[in-house]
Amino acid sequence: MAIRYIFGRAGRGKSYLALEEIKQKLQEEEDNKLFLLVPEQFTLQAERDLIRKQELTGMMRAEVLSFTRLAHRVFSEVGGLTRVPINELGKNMILRKIADESLKELSIYQSIAKQDGFITKLNELICEMKQHDITPTELTMELNEIEEETILKRKLEDITLLYQRFNNYLKGQYVDNEDHVNLLIENIERVEFLEGAEIWIDGFQSFTPQIIRVIEKLAQKVANITITFTMELNAKEKDKDLFHITQKTYLKVKTIAQKFNLDEEVINLDIEERKVLPKEKEIAHIEREFNTYPYKQYADEIANLEIFAGSNLYSEMENVAAQIIHLVRNRGYRWNDIALVSGGLDQYSMILKRVFEEYHIPYFIDEKRSIMNNPMIELILSSIEILSRGYQYEDVFSFLKTGFSDLTKDEVEQLENYVLQYGIRGKAYSEPFTKGFEKKQIQQKDKEEGEKQIDEEKKEKYNELRMRFIAPFAKFEKRIYRKKKIGEITKALFEFMKELNIEDKLNQWIEELREEKYFEYVNENTQIWNKIMEIFDQLTEILADESATLKEYGRILEAGFLACKVGVIPSTIDQVLVGSIERSKSHDIKALFVVGVNDGVLPFGQEDGGILLDHERESLVKKGISIGTTLESSLLEEQFMIYSAFSKPTEYLWVSYALADQEGKAMRQSILIDRFKKLFKNLRIKSDVVNDVDRQLHLITTPISTFKYMTENIRQNVDDKAMADMWWDVYDWYSKEPTWEDRRKLMVKGLFHQNQITYIGENKAKSLYDNPIKSSVSRLERFANCPFSHFVTYGLRPKERKEYQLSNPDIGRLFHDSMEQFTKEMVNEEIQWKDLTKEKNDELVEKVIDEMVPDFEHGIMLSTHRYQYLVTRLKRISKRAMWTLTDHVKKGEFVPMGHEIIFGLEGDVPPIIIELANGEKIYLEGRIDRVDLLNDEEDGNYVKIIDYKSGSKEFSLSDVYYGLQIQLMVYLDAILSSEEKKHQVEIHPGGIFYFKIDDPMVKTTEKVVEEVEKEINKKLKMKGLVLKDVNIIKKMDRSIGRSSTIVPAGLTKDDEISKSSSALPEEDFKALLNHVRRLVKEIGEEMLKGNVKIEPFKKGGDTSCKYCDYIAICQFDNSFHDNQYKNIKELKSDEVLERIKKESQKKLE
């Protein structure tokens, strides 16, 4: 019996020698077993290497195993495994159950124990403790020695509690991977196949105490053990840190040899004549000097090392791809001669896939993938949540959108639209859908019979979809009714999946993926059913008789899924191997690309997110309890890992980093880059920031990738920027390739694309817009804001998906409707405004809103507590608003003439008719919230227009001038015209106002109610324009003084209108009305000419794009020459009037 040690620095050929020795042993006529033991994640690569090494017809005597697999081999021969084995999935589910049940007893971890990530961390910690032979008893003893009440002590109390309960749960019934190893230790001496066997252990930097005990047992059983150590046997002082962990591991193994008096043999590959794998000089220099202090500098010219700085992550990966193509084409490399590693593979993974596919580089990403985003897992978890949470929208459509339900994609979208529009959830799914199909809606007087029939058909369709969705759930719910055992729920869940025919649907989907050549996803999804069944098996094996609510069951199941990873097998051998730097184990490679060498990525930033922090682990080490790695050992391991990676290739090393991330935020280079600069005197960092011709030439690789660069460069040429002549040669190549003809033409068209269209023509405009044109004021204002926005709204007419929620316009409509109904109630009860009391005001508001709420938007106001509170708030605001308006009436002489007055072809008041130059007419229509009238024998007849606003609205004459705010003027015009014709008397404008519906908060030191009310009334003062006539103003507010609390006006002590008042004489009112009519005519004519120009206004810092829903459609970009704002200047009132007068004069001339 002997232990052999193979020593050598990275890349000296230790693994190569081990494989050579196994090959030679296989050629001998012996029957003893040969085993190569490697870390679990490297078994596949080691098997490949072993097969590739052999030139024999068979290798039955040789096996590649991990220590876990060795345990299974032992148990298959001698038995000894009387307990049920559980994997990481089972452990996670048990720990989730234990943590949930122990929540009230936990101290530090009570809140975070509910989080998903906690169970994974707890599992890792328990694994570490078992691997280091630490029991709950030892932790308890340590706790007894800690007298003071520290956070560490409280943490250890929680950990000990959970660890002990976990062990108690397993005791006598179940065995995990760590217990497997302990059982392996107990059974090694009983195994016959290890008699006379030879073992090679390769690829380990260190061994846990548990594995050291395995090696100790093996050393007493097998003929000999050979262990490789990546270290220099007689390391100099400057290298001792680098090999510190390996040195400690070697000394532990050596102790075993000495303890049992075993023969020892040392093979040192660092001796010149034993070197088996020659490397290029640059790589050899990195291996020798990268981690040494002091170091030797490399002064020769550099041919096989490149450091590259990409302008961003994507650019970095594009240059990597171009260099890989270069190596394959110009240096004769095969794809599998190349590997790529990164410290931040998650950050690069999606970019890498896109770029490598664009460059036609075959690749394999060596990673264990989480199954949490797989649609099968989404289906199972959402199914549980549908029942446990009561058919919430998110759960229902997470389930339906997996593609495994019995509804098609179109049907899911139809059902989703209905559910969102009418707020369907909970019990509503178990009853026929009726919302939107109520009798009073279907039988509206303006509905045709055909529409009624369509409604009935829709109702039947939606209910048919509802039944097809809910039927399997009804059976599932029935099966688990009053069932509390996890085994029973799991069985019901499996039956539910069978009923949905999930396995066949999954296989069908896999075939579709295979046909579309998505082999990566084929590989993943062919494993998913077995993984799910494995989790179900673990549940029924270890938790079947445990009780759980459906919600708890879902959390336990999710914990199992979180622990589950799938490994994807390479689809071909000749491809670039991609992996994370910490777990990547490749065959012998010629070229290595190390990407993402940025600060915090490589070396890794300090992650201190475990259950025990680094300083707490250090504290335990001082007390003799070593739980896994400490910060110091982690840094040493990382140093060794980086050293191993940089030393891996034999011919070429590329190291790159990004100067910015995908969002453009600056990124710093790693300290490793500075190290390279010091080691290599002639090193020059290349970059694509300086885009020289050589760098551009380097990127001309494949037709797909090059096409993009060609387009970018020709775009620069079109924009009068410098471009290398070679790009015209590239363009010439594409122009001669028939397969690229269509894309080339599209590219040329795109280069000269103008993001603008001005007119679509009169005929198209007439076909788009209904004739005769009946226009609202808001439509005209939208055109004035931007013709294209008007075209989309009233021409294309896109519809937003309706959702069961209140928007600001809905709330505004509710206010308007309630105020309209309020006035109707006053009429019904024959109450005059001047007679209305505060009590009656509040009573009517309560009544009106209570009657409106149940039917408003299908009862949305009663659907949640939040909306029910909003009803209370709406009542409060409405009471304040109505009482304020009542107060206005009481303080003035104007009397409300009408509310919600409709002017239009079918309205109470005729429309405003504007005749256009081509003979067409525009009929202006609208609804006026309130019109007040003053009939005075001395002063005449005056009208006051009030528009209610639920939000803030300032009145601006400048906006009126530009057509952005013509609503009040049009309303005034409609009333003046109709009333004068109707009564054959002259009607004068009294004022136009916005009234904000609000119950504002005020800051005041006053405690007298009347004074507070006065402050509130100031806040509710109407905004707009009043006639510049003292008598009329006083008849709007008899109590007016220096400032009115009703209208935007005030009087001086001489009883004159103050300068701060928003007031105009009647002739200016008329001038404004005429100007608005001219504007309407101009807008109408442009509308019918087909003006759809993308031309939003810009006024100061404000633009009409700010609240526009169509910015994604027009794609307006001010940096384009043909996309420019219509700049308008903010005008003062006198400037507006002066311009209007000048324009009127020109018209007359």
Curated annotation (Swiss-Prot):
CC cofactor: Mg(2+); [4Fe-4S] cluster
Protein residues bound to ATP: G8, R9, A10, G11, R12, G13, K14, S15
Keyword presence, DNA damage: yes
Binding site for [4Fe-4S] cluster: C786, C1105, C1108, C1114
Role: The heterodimer acts as both an ATP-dependent DNA helicase and an ATP-dependent, dual-direction single-stranded exonuclease. Recognizes the chi site generating a DNA molecule suitable for the initiation of homologous recombination. The AddB subunit has 5' -> 3' nuclease activity but not helicase activity.
Subunit relationships: Heterodimer of AddA and AddB.
One annotated GO molecular function: 5'-3' exonuclease activity
Designated name of the protein: ATP-dependent helicase/deoxyribonuclease subunit B
PANTHER family, alphabetized: RECBCD ENZYME SUBUNIT RECC
General remark: Despite having conserved helicase domains, this subunit does not have helicase activity.
Keyword ATP-binding belongs to the record: yes
NCBIfam families: addB_Gpos
UvrD-like helicase C-terminal domain location: 273-586
Enzyme class, first EC level, given as a word: hydrolase
Keywords recorded for this protein, A-Z: 4Fe-4S, ATP-binding, DNA damage, DNA repair, DNA-binding, Exonuclease, Helicase, Hydrolase, Iron, Iron-sulfur, Metal-binding, Nuclease, Nucleotide-binding
Family the entry assigns: Belongs to the helicase family. AddB/RexB type 1 subfamily.
Gene Ontology process terms (BP): double-strand break repair via homologous recombination
Co-factor binding comment: Binds 1 [4Fe-4S] cluster.
EC numbers for this chain: 3.1.-.-
Domain named UvrD-like helicase ATP-binding: residues: 1-276
